[in-house]
C-alpha cells in the first residue's frame, strides 16, 4: 500500500511555532501543498474547513496526470492532543469533466488545531510523504449546514434582455435564472444554488460547475429550484477589463468574498423545502456527488 501523509491545520490564529510531525512540517504553516518524493502531489480542494463534520476534497496528481483509484482509506487524527486516536474513513473518487477527478469524504473535526491525514491507496507499494497545510477559523465564515442563508435578490433573466448581462457562461441555460434566491427560499421546494463564474474558472480545483448544474436539472422530474448566481455583477464590462469587476450583492450577502482565494472557486448549496442548508460544497462538485445530495433532501 502506498501512503500519502497529509497534514492539515485547523486553527483560530496564525501559530507562532515550528511543528516537526514525522519530519514533514516546518515553520511555513500557510503553504498549501508539497510534491512527494516520486512526483505525486496532493491538491486540497477544500481550503475553508472549520470545526464540525466537513466534506474534504482533494486531487492526487503525478507526472502523467490525475491519480485515480475507486477509493482511498484515510486515517485522521488531531496531532496536538495526547488522547487523539485514528479515525478511519473512506474517500471516494469522483470523475470530473475533461479527464480530471477528486476524492471526497466526510470528516469530523471536533476541535481546532493541527490534524494529520494519512491517505492509503492500494495500487502503489511505497511510502510517499507529502503534506497539505490548512488554515481556517473555528466557526464557519459563510452560511453553514443547518442554517437559513440570506434571502438574496439574485438576478433573473427577466432583469435583462441580454443573458450576457447576468452570467459569464458561454452557452447559458436560461432556466437557471428563472427565479431569485429569495423566491426559492420561500416556495417550499428543495433548491440547488451554485455561485460560480464560468468564464473565470482557472484554478486546478475549479470545474464547469454551471454545466453540471444544468445537466443535473435536466435529469430530474421532481420539482426543484436550480439557480446559478454569477460571482460578478457586471459580466459584460469585465470581459476585456477584469479590473472593472464588481462583486454581485448576493455573493457579499453570503460572505463568499471574505474567503481566501474565493475569486476562482465555486460554492454550491443544497437546501431542503424549508430553505435550510443541508449540504455545502466548496470548489467543483461532480454531478454524481451532487445528485446524492439532492436525492437526500427529496427523500426527507
For the regions a protein language model found, what residue spans apply to each?
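Thiol-based oxidoreductase modules, predominantly thioredoxin-like and allied folds used
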Residues: 195, 221-240
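C-terminal motif of bacterial Sec signal peptides marking the signal peptidase cleavage site
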Residues: 15-18
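Short active-site neighborhood of thiol/selenol oxidoreductases, capturing the structured segment around
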Residues: 162-167, 173, 181-202
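Typically the conserved alpha-helix immediately C-terminal to a functionally engaged Cys/Sec
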Residues: 203-220
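Thioredoxin-like thiol-disulfide oxidoreductase module
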Residues: 231-265, 270-274, 296
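Contiguous segments within soluble domain cores/interaction surfaces
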Residues: 23-114, 118-164
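Short, glycine-anchored, charge-dense loop/turn motifs used at functional sites
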Residues: 80-81, 270-278
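Thiol-/selenol-based redox modules, centered on thioredoxin-like
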Residues: 143, 155-161, 276-300
